[in-house]
Amino acid sequence: MLRQIIGQAKKHPSLIPLFVFIGTGATGATLYLLRLALFNPDVCWDRNNPEPWNKLGPNDQYKFYSVNVDYSKLKKERPDF
């Protein structure tokens, strides 16, 4: 497969940017799915802990990007379970 891509790139050099962008997009999508699978509190890999989101405090940031919220200064407004 890689040999075909290199062969096509040698024959048609205008395809090189296309291969670069497709490879970058596939790598980014894979890394994003890996991030969601490992760090998202909605995903549960441990059957002994069926509700992992209860361990998160109000100052834990699990969003991908937050604009103006400083999570370290938030007060705790919910009870412990």
Swiss-Prot record:
It comes from the Eukaryota. GO terms for biological process: cellular respiration; mitochondrial electron transport, cytochrome c to oxygen; mitochondrial electron transport, NADH to ubiquinone. The chain crosses the membrane at residues 15-37. Disulfide bonds: none annotated. The modification Phosphoserine is found at S66. InterPro entries: B12D. Keywords: Acetylation, Electron transport, Leigh syndrome, Membrane, Mitochondrion, Mitochondrion inner membrane, Phosphoprotein, Primary mitochondrial disease, Respiratory chain, Transmembrane, Transmembrane helix, Transport. One of its GO terms (molecular function) is NADH dehydrogenase (ubiquinone) activity. Residues 1-14 are mitochondrial matrix. Coiled coil: none annotated. During complex IV purifications dissociates from complex IV upon treatment with standard detergent DDM (decyl beta-D-maltoside) in high concentrations. Component of the cytochrome c oxidase, the last enzyme in the mitochondrial electron transport chain which drives oxidative phosphorylation. The respiratory chain contains 3 multisubunit complexes succinate dehydrogenase (complex II, CII), ubiquinol-cytochrome c oxidoreductase (cytochrome b-c1 complex, complex III, CIII) and cytochrome c oxidase (complex IV, CIV), that cooperate to transfer electrons derived from NADH and succinate to molecular oxygen, creating an electrochemical gradient over the inner membrane that drives transmembrane transport and the ATP synthase. This is Cytochrome c oxidase subunit NDUFA4. It comes from Homo sapiens (Human).
